[in-house]
UniProtKB/Swiss-Prot annotation:
Binding, ATP: P117, T118, G119, S120, G121, K122, T123, L124
InterPro entries (UniProt xref): AAA+_ATPase, ATP-dep_Clp_protease_ClpX, ATPase_AAA_core, Clp_ATPase_C, Clp_protease_ATP-bd_su_ClpX, ClpX_bact, P-loop_NTPase, Znf_CppX_C4
ClpX-type ZB domain span: 1-54
Record family assignment: Belongs to the ClpX chaperone family.
Species lineage: Bacteria, Bacillati, Bacillota, Bacilli, Bacillales
GO molecular-function terms, A-Z: ATP binding; ATP hydrolysis activity; ATP-dependent protein folding chaperone; protein dimerization activity; unfolded protein binding; zinc ion binding
Role of this protein: ATP-dependent specificity component of the Clp protease. It directs the protease to specific substrates. Can perform chaperone functions in the absence of ClpP.
Taxonomic source organism: Shouchella clausii (strain KSM-K16) (Alkalihalobacillus clausii)
Protein name in UniProt: ATP-dependent Clp protease ATP-binding subunit ClpX
Claim: DNA-binding is one of the keywords in the record: no
UniProt signal peptide: none
CC terms in the record's Gene Ontology section: HslUV protease complex
Pfam families xrefs: AAA_2, ClpB_D2-small, zf-C4_ClpX
Binding site for Zn(2+): C13, C16, C35, C38
Alphabetically ordered keywords of this record: ATP-binding, Chaperone, Metal-binding, Nucleotide-binding, Zinc
Gene for this chain: clpX
């Protein structure tokens, strides 16, 4: 097993064959030896390979219009939000790749705030971005966070979710995206600082500051404080992109008051402000509005890009039902297709479903529960029936709970509750 020089009986390198007299150091392994020269050569080869991968990664960043185009496949509407997100994400990863070179100008990080009503697509936009860029992605809920030392989740647990999403590859996690949902719930109760401790509001904002800006954080691999002796994972958040989203209920009133102050007086165009629809005020949001809402100035400063999403109208919800690659109608059609049944939704049925979602104020998120209620009896009965080959969902199915129209192979109409008896 051991490599000896036949003449002198000396140990020699198992790779290059040089004896221990010909090299500075010989490292022993189980039955093999490697010299310092071979170690240096192997290190250079590995570094060259890693350098090649990094160059490929730089070339693979999609352009903003390409990112926006892919977002269009999954998210309906919200054009301005898509544009601002595409540019921000492109610049963020361009900045990361430029940091490997020695540059005179240092580019700062641009975290993003998404403001929009529930079900408008905030989370879906962030998820789709992570899928496009093929980077680790984690979703955190701000409502469960508390200041360190209090019952609840520490802010470091957000980073643990990202590390887990990267399969504990810290280097990969350091280039990931974190979406913090319900960020409006950590707003302090009033615009003015309070003398009482606000551990789940302003305290959380203070705790998030360094992570948002970029710091080396110590993350407990098992989470929480139950294992005080565990070794901590060190992660640098300088290149982690943070997207904070929330409904910010009540901020429209703050924006209205600010706009109202500017139009008081003679010769002002009051009608111009009155033309704005309820959801359109969000597009006028400024950092000062977030300050009045209850976010602290330091927190707002670390989220420089503010993008608003408008409430979805009936037409947009109908498009969401039918157009995206993972549209709900396509999903249910596929489910029934597996039972050899063709599913059809009439135009009036789609509009009634959309109107019901608007009435419930659940946005796109509420569409599935509405369709599930309509389709329950259909999906219960159809698998056991051999006579029905087509199912038509019409408007009355949504508004009056009427049964859908079933058709046989020869075009005969069937009833859902009374299966046709076979001869």
């Amino acid at each position: 097993m051991f490599k000896f020089n036949e003449e002198k009986g000396q140990l020699k390198c198992s790779f290059c064959g040089k004896t221990q007299d010909q090299v500075r150091k010989l490292v022993a392994g189980p039955g093999v030896y490697i010299c310092d020269e071979c170690i240096e050569l192997c290190t250079e080869i590995v570094e060259e390979e890693l350098g090649t991968d990094e160059e490929v990664e730089i070339e693979e960043i999609p352009k903003p219009n390409e990112i926006c185009s892919i977002l269009d496949d999954y998210v309906i509407g919200q054009r301005e939000a898509k544009k601002s997100l595409s540019v921000a994400v492109y610049n963020h990863y361009k900045r990361i790749n430029s940091m490997s070179r020695s540059e005179d100008v240092e580019l700062s990080k641009s975290n993003i705030t998404l403001i929009g009503p529930t079900g408008s697509g905030k989370t879906l936009l962030a998820q789709t971005l992570a899928r496009i860029l093929n980077v680790p992605f984690a979703i955190a809920d701000a409502t469960s966070l508390t200041e360190a030392g209090y019952v609840g989740e520490d802010v470091e647990n957000i980073l643990l979710k990202l590390i887990q999403a990267a399969d504990y590859d810290v280097e990969k996690a350091e280039k990931g995206i974190i979406y913090i949902d319900e960020i409006d719930k950590v707003a302090r109760k009033s615009e003015n600082p309070s003398i009482t401790r606000d551990v789940s509001g302003e305290g959380v904002q203070q705790a998030l500051l360094k992570i948002l800006e970029g710091t080396t954080a110590s993350v407990p691999p098992q989470g929480g404080r139950k294992h005080p002796h565990q070794e901590f994972i060190q992660i640098d958040t300088t290149n982690v992109l943070f997207i904070c989203g929330g409904a910010f209920d009540g901020i429209e009133q703050i924006i209205k008051r600010r706009l109202g102050k500017k139009v008081i007086g003679f010769g002002t165009d009051d009608a111009k402000q009155d033309d704005l629809k309820p959801g359109e005020y969000l597009s006028k949001v400024l950092p000062e509005d977030l300050l009045r809402f209850g976010l602290i100035p330091e927190f707002i400063g670390r989220l420089p890009i503010i993008s608003s999403l408008s409430p979805l109208d009936t037409d947009a919800l109908v498009e969401i039902l039918t157009k995206p690659k993972n549209a709900l109608v396509k999903q249910y059609q596929k489910l029934l297709e597996l039972d050899d049944v063709e599913l059809e939704f009439t135009e009036d049925a789609l509009r009634e479903i959309a109107n019901k979602a608007i009435e419930r104020k659940t946005g796109a998120r509420g569409l599935r529960s509405i369709i599930e209620g309509i389709m329950l009896d259909v999906m219960f009965d159809l698998p056991s029936r051999e006579d029905a080959v087509k199912c038509i969902i019409h408007g009355a199915c949504v508004t009056d709970d009427a049964p859908p129209i079933l058709k046989s192979a020869d075009g005969t109409e069937l009833t859902l509750d009374k299966p046709k008896e076979s001869a």
